[in-house]
Amino acid sequence: MQKKVIAAIIGTSAISAVAATQANAATTHTVKPGESVWAISNKYGISIAKLKSLNNLTSNLIFPNQVLKVSGSSNSTSNSSRPSTNSGGGSYYTVQAGDSLSLIASKYGTTYQNIMRLNGLNNFFIYPGQKLKVSGTASSSNSTSNSSRPSTNSSGGSYYTVQAGDSLSLIASKYGTTYQNIMRLNGLNNFFIYPGQKLKVTGNASTNSGSTTTTNRGYNTPVFNHQNLYTWGQCTYHVFNRRAEIGKGISTYWWNANNWDNAAAADGYTIDNRPTVGSIAQTDVGYYGHVMFVERVNNDGSILVSEMNYSAAPGILTYRTVPAYQVNNYRYIH
């Protein structure tokens, strides 16, 4: 009888050890389309705060194919901030959550324009896990021949696979269409796209597009082609760059955020209290006021905005959802 008890204990211990080993093996998780930090933290039995701490996340924004730590200790910045080198010459940096081109450039004593040139970037969009060249000579353009040729399928229409550095406006210009049309064809209600995503660029819109968000169609929207002279890392700096990314550049002479509504109106922009994707949310609250870029308008009336110098230090890009009951506290520059 005693032998049986001992055997049972040994067997149970072995099973527990295997289970513990399996649990410990799950130290990382690759983000799948549609997943959220809440779903991932719930899956691994950790808090959202713990998940964000492990991965140095400054917001709840995550991307498909992003690899997240789900156990262990938080990543130290010593390795991530040290560029790697390769035999082809030059140094590389792996983008971390919360990075921006300007922030990376300041780390390595260069300019964001130089990083864009080294990597063949034509917009400011970068994503966690992306490897950027930070020194050396620019890579020869080698990936546009196939990636820029849309594929077709039997159901009609052509498709394009998103490459690193792409934006909706850039893709639209490649195929002689508008970013609004690409959003309509794919049922998009915000400007978020990611490498590897397949977008329809010609044909008819899908019947199940379900998007209730409209872009700023019908608004008077002048377009400027100015250099960004706003102070680096401020809310005005970010919104200027974000509008340039979508092909709706604004003036670099609107000064502080609390002057943007009046200055925009003087330049001929439509100003109202109705947010649309791509519009600028503006408030006079605070000494200098504040501006944000509207990334998405949700079905419940809330809006997702991107901003700088609000809940984090200057130069750190953050995202937050403005509740529906607060949306009317802002004016929207279209």
UniProtKB/Swiss-Prot annotation:
The catalysed reaction is:
Hydrolyzes the link between N-acetylmuramoyl residues and L-amino acid residues in certain cell-wall glycopeptides
Domain LysM: residue ranges: 27-70, 91-134, 158-201
Family annotation (SMART domains): LysM
Q: Which SUPFAM superfamilies match?
A: Cysteine proteinases (SSF54001), LysM domain (SSF54106)
Cite a single Pfam family from the UniProt record.
LysM
- EC class of this enzyme? hydrolase
Q: What is its EC number?
A: 3.5.1.28
* Name assigned to this protein: N-acetylmuramoyl-L-alanine amidase sle1
Origin species: Staphylococcus aureus (strain MRSA252)
